[in-house]
Amino acid sequence: MPEGPEIRRAADNLEAAIKGKPLTDVWFAFSQLKPYESPLIGQTVTHIETRGKALLTHFSQGLTLYSHNQLYGVWRVVETGNIPATTRVLRVNLQTADKTILLYSASDIEMLTPEQLATHPFLQRVGPDVLDPRLTPSDVKARLLSARFRNRQFSGLLLDQAFLAGLGNYLRVEILWQVGLTGQHKAKDLSDQQLEALSHALLDIPRLSYTTRGQADENTHHGALFRFKVFHRDGEACERCGGIIEKTTLSSRPFYWCPHCQT
């Protein structure tokens, strides 16, 4: 599943295609969304927001399209009038004079008023987004030490969108390697120095992934500035200590780590 950096880059591509352009045609697959098709024609997309792995497409008249790709959903940008042949099921079509954005295969799609947006169950449950520039390491440290999260093992905590939105498995693996911790560690047991390092890494690594145009790939990642240190590198030598990277399963997900320097 794509993680926060990939979702944000997808949102950037969608924005670049249609932001500020009048919609010339709108189509939704789901019957509960059909009443919004005609009223949206002539409106514009003002911006597209990400909250972890959810996209919020904001329209000029105040409505917001909520979508969550889950495992199979995918957005595409195409030239208007050039819808590609595919076996995927089309769910959303937002068309402008020159560009069209298409959402395939997703099933979690809603149209929200401002009041509904403010009280949406998923958005109420999800934590602050790691790509939100307003979020600071001090904020993250406070969350780590809060009663809600301080006694949680990192193997599960770093996958919990209620802690920080946008983290996923490759980020979990790379962050813990960066700070030399294991999935069994808990915030309450760390020194202040370890907490500081982890609080920074929880923001620095996702943001590096985003800014260096990362694409999820099992071999390399993050372009020239960053590559996977341990993710999908079991059996290889750790570049930090020379130990052999191992693979196990933590919180029902593959976990990669170096037992020699992650202690």
From Swiss-Prot:
One biological process term in Gene Ontology: base-excision repair
Active site (catalytic residues): 2-3, 53, 253
UniProt cofactor note: Binds 1 zinc ion per subunit.
GO terms assigned for molecular function: class I DNA-(apurinic or apyrimidinic site) endonuclease activity; damaged DNA binding; oxidized pyrimidine nucleobase lesion DNA N-glycosylase activity; zinc ion binding
EC number(s) reported in the record: 3.2.2.-, 4.2.99.18
Entries under PROSITE patterns matching the protein: FPG_CAT (PS51068), ZF_FPG_1 (PS01242), ZF_FPG_2 (PS51066)
Keyword DNA repair recorded: yes
Keywords, comma-separated and alphabetical: DNA damage, DNA repair, DNA-binding, Glycosidase, Hydrolase, Lyase, Metal-binding, Multifunctional enzyme, Zinc, Zinc-finger
One Pfam family linked to the record: Fapy_DNA_glyco
FPG-type zinc-finger residues: 229-263
Keyword Transport listed: no
Residues bound to DNA: 70, 125, 169
Catalytic activity as recorded in UniProt: 2'-deoxyribonucleotide-(2'-deoxyribose 5'-phosphate)-2'-deoxyribonucleotide-DNA = a 3'-end 2'-deoxyribonucleotide-(2,3-dehydro-2,3-deoxyribose 5'-phosphate)-DNA + a 5'-end 5'-phospho-2'-deoxyribonucleoside-DNA + H(+)
Cofactor entry: Zn(2+)
Highest rank taxon of the organism: Bacteria
SUPFAM superfamilies given in the database record: Glucocorticoid receptor-like (DNA-binding domain), N-terminal domain of MutM-like DNA repair proteins, S13-like H2TH domain
Family recorded in the similarity comment: Belongs to the FPG family.
HAMAP family tied to this protein: Endonuclease_8
Protein role: Involved in base excision repair of DNA damaged by oxidation or by mutagenic agents. Acts as a DNA glycosylase that recognizes and removes damaged bases. Has a preference for oxidized pyrimidines, such as thymine glycol, 5,6-dihydrouracil and 5,6-dihydrothymine. Has AP (apurinic/apyrimidinic) lyase activity and introduces nicks in the DNA strand. Cleaves the DNA backbone by beta-delta elimination to generate a single-strand break at the site of the removed base with both 3'- and 5'-phosphates.
Listed name of the protein: Endonuclease 8
Species, as recorded: Citrobacter koseri (strain ATCC BAA-895 / CDC 4225-83 / SGSC4696)
Origin organism lineage: Bacteria, Pseudomonadati, Pseudomonadota, Gammaproteobacteria, Enterobacterales
